[in-house]
Amino acid sequence: MGFSLTDYAPYDFANRRHIGPSPKEMGQMLATLGVPSLEALINEALPEGIRRRDPLAFGPALSERDTLHRMRELADKNTVLTSLIGQGYHGTHTPPVILRNILENPAWYTAYTPYQPEISQGRLEALLNFQTMMADLTGLPIANASLLDEGTAAAEAMAMAQRASKSKARGFFVAEDCHPQTIDVIRTRAEPLGIEVIVGAVDALDPEAVFAALFQYPGSYGHVRDYSDVIEALHGARALAVVAADPLALTLLKSPGEMGADIAIGSTQRFGVPMGYGGPHAAYMTCTDALKRSMPGRIIGVSVDARGNKAYRLSLQTREQHIRREKANSNVCTAQALLAVMASMYGVFHGPDGLKAIAQTVHRKTARMADGLTELGFKVDPQDYFDTITVKVGSMQGVILAAALREGVNLRKVGTDRIGITLDELTLGRTIEAVWRAFGAEGMVYDKTRMVYHLPQEMLRESSYMTHPIFHMNRAEAEMTRYMRRLADRDLALDRAMIPLGSCTMKLNATVEMLPLTWPEFANLHPFAPADQAAGYHEMIAELSQMLCDVTGYDAMSMQPNSGAQGEYAGLLAIRGYHRARGEGHRNICLIPTSAHGTNPASAQMVGWKVVVVKSAENGDIDLEDFRAKAEQHSENLAGCMITYPSTHGVFEEIVREVCDITHAHGGQVYIDGANMNAMVGLSAPGDLGGDVSHLNLHKTFCIPHGGGGPGMGPIGVKAHLAPHLPSHATATGAGFGDAGAVASAAYGSPSILTISYAYCLLMGGAGLTQATKVAILNANYMAKRLSAGFPILYANDKGRVAHECILDTRVLDKIAGVTVEDVAKRLMDCGFHAPTMSWPVAGTLMVEPTESEPKAELDRFCDAMLAIREEADAIAAGSLDAENNPLKRAPHTVEDLVGDWDRPYSREQACYPPGAFRVDKYWPPVNRVDNAYGDRNLVCTCPPVEDYAEPAE
């Protein structure tokens, strides 16, 4: 047999690694659909009028090896010095056991938000640990499971305080020693809501003039102050107190709760999460019990399952935007779950004694640094501090900063005559000596045996914290590794099975895309370091911005929004700024279809707009006549509309251009939600359809993993006329920045995870990205075809095609057998699947999105499982299965069910091994169905007492 060349391309990442179905499988799927080619299917699914004419101009795809080489080139252009800038960002040591077993572990980073608690018990416990740690440290009983960053958390606290305060004042006081970036984010949030931000000295605060006040603790310039008297005065005026507290400092200092604070916020970045040039990190929020229903973000609570065993779940969801829409507490959806898990594990790893020891070491080194500078003749402020000092240097500021740079150290420029210095757990004695040299010392040596303290005695913490046994476990690495493994094994993530959540795009997060994230050159840069030290970052961001402009048809891109919801908010601020610049600031009406994401109306409310709801037609499209009538009715005040494309019903609407034209004709701007961009990349572009602004969910379309509920990124693309109104930031100017104010603490949001999306674009190239979109549409239509044998497909176009997702009308099961959509979701767990999106956008249905990454075998396994569920419902309807005591109503089934007494009228085999379930590698849900009502009636959002963990006696 002669030697012949193969046409197999092993390094073709797009077609061999990212896209699931093989060419042979695609042929089989196309045959099932009755179309001769993939292009023929796309022609049937997409209206001709929305197709883009030019291919993506990305250049050829790179191999994994070449992509890593390019990432290394960029990394080498970053210069990582020792940053003692502080301002809320600190050097930290990520314990390798946490780095490897959490951040680099797909069992953790590929999971979805834990809406299905039975298959999310591991990360729910880790997030409950986070809440417990923060509640204990801050001395306040209620904690949420993270917010986006400290600045956003402060803005959310302001809005929360306004909702809850009994004061009629419109002012919000911000202490002048709060972090500057926090003040900027607060100003941006306050202005559209008509809140007056009063920045000033604490001693000048008039409690009667404000509904709440924010204090930094310790202050940005180092001051440690007891705010008890000020808070008491605020309460006397019926106003609330918010304290932005450093969690490491709270191991040594009196807690905000002990001072009487109503709300505490801050960042947990220094708990083992790298700075990443600004993010991502988990912010926290805690509050008094009286304010719990006003709190934004996710709250993990303790409930029970059907057997009465302890189980965790998301609590008080009626506060959230997917239910309350424009009346929601916040538009926050994605937060920072993965980073909160890392921070919680840092707390478990060190325990309270370890955290206190780290804090004492940091303070002792800071005190020694200060004493040395005092010996050199400099005036050091304040007298009492934790880790930050400010040095009066007069006209020597520039000389000293430059000298420190030569020593490899970044210091903070404060005003024109001061320098700020913040130490952290990584600060070495030789770094302190280098700073002394920069200040002119010769031969001064750091003596680590010299004990110096500068904490006020009356402020030292006496209350206990982190007393739960989980923070006192054996911290040998073997036990830590096993604990994290046990939690991971309780969860169902993409490393086990497809997660076909509609509108969530749970696609492959390739290992090669994730690798550069943890490289020191990307991970260890301070966001306020001199710009020339981040040249690699800036080059990458500029290239990625250009790629995304090509994808979307827009002219400019802002990378600052660090979630999809923040992207919506920033996009609407751009529209608002545009109207105001043209003297039309009165425009405040936003048209939003009934089928819109719940974040849309919540975001509109945040910029001070009024929401006018537009009906949907019977085929799922926007009701064009209703849209036209309402645009005409509100023509004088129309700010814009928010639509999703393809629609949230999973269909490419042919009327999209007409909707845009109507909006523009009445003076409005068009916001096209980018949640469904996975159906458009390379085939259509929102900017070409008439959109003025869109956000992209990089954690959906561009491969940033969901992390069990964050991180995410929501950059916005805009047409040229909106570019002057993009977000701004005090530390950055130029392309991608405008005049809208800051919407995140860091200029580029969470830039370290942009490495993932950038690598994805390099690996795929323009042709690969376009092929991925086509296969996403193929997979969805193949599943719709197979599943139509058991369930009506609720919406399709006139050719019977869907976009990248489809809605299964599972209400038919309720009609014939009393089987609810929740029963179906729980039964899918027995099959080893996470349920599709439940009851949205249509109550009682499932929205299925397989993405391009799933191979045919996994699609078929899911279809087999769903069709078997239909057969079980038919058996109930026929009377061969009991109406209540059946596999659907009792799902999910656990090992405890299997080994216990079996008194059910169906077999163990039928319960635990339905079609679709693996036999050898079966996933076992760790708990039975969770009682949601019990969890809300009996809210517990910190770790339950140790007795609850005890195994029941025989």
Curated annotation (Swiss-Prot):
Modified residues (N6-(pyridoxal phosphate)lysine): 700
Subunit field text: The glycine cleavage system is composed of four proteins: P, T, L and H.
GO function terms (MF aspect): glycine binding; glycine dehydrogenase (decarboxylating) activity; pyridoxal phosphate binding
Keywords, ordered alphabetically: Oxidoreductase, Pyridoxal phosphate
Documented EC number(s): 1.4.4.2
Reaction(s) this enzyme catalyzes, per UniProt: N(6)-[(R)-lipoyl]-L-lysyl-[glycine-cleavage complex H protein] + glycine + H(+) = N(6)-[(R)-S(8)-aminomethyldihydrolipoyl]-L-lysyl-[glycine-cleavage complex H protein] + CO2
Gene behind the chain: gcvP
Record-linked InterPro entries: GcvP (IPR003437), GDC-P_C (IPR049316), GDC-P_N (IPR049315), GDC_P (IPR020581), PyrdxlP-dep_Trfase (IPR015424), PyrdxlP-dep_Trfase_major (IPR015421), PyrdxlP-dep_Trfase_small (IPR015422)
Cofactor names: pyridoxal 5'-phosphate
SUPFAM superfamilies the record matches: PLP-dependent transferases (SSF53383)
Role of this protein: The glycine cleavage system catalyzes the degradation of glycine. The P protein binds the alpha-amino group of glycine through its pyridoxal phosphate cofactor; CO(2) is released and the remaining methylamine moiety is then transferred to the lipoamide cofactor of the H protein.
Pfam family, one: GDC-P
Superkingdom in the source lineage: Bacteria
BP terms from Gene Ontology: glycine decarboxylation via glycine cleavage system
Family: Belongs to the GcvP family.
Class in the EC hierarchy, top level: oxidoreductase
Organism name: Dinoroseobacter shibae (strain DSM 16493 / NCIMB 14021 / DFL 12)
Name of the featured protein: Glycine dehydrogenase (decarboxylating)
GO-annotated cellular components: cytosol; glycine cleavage complex
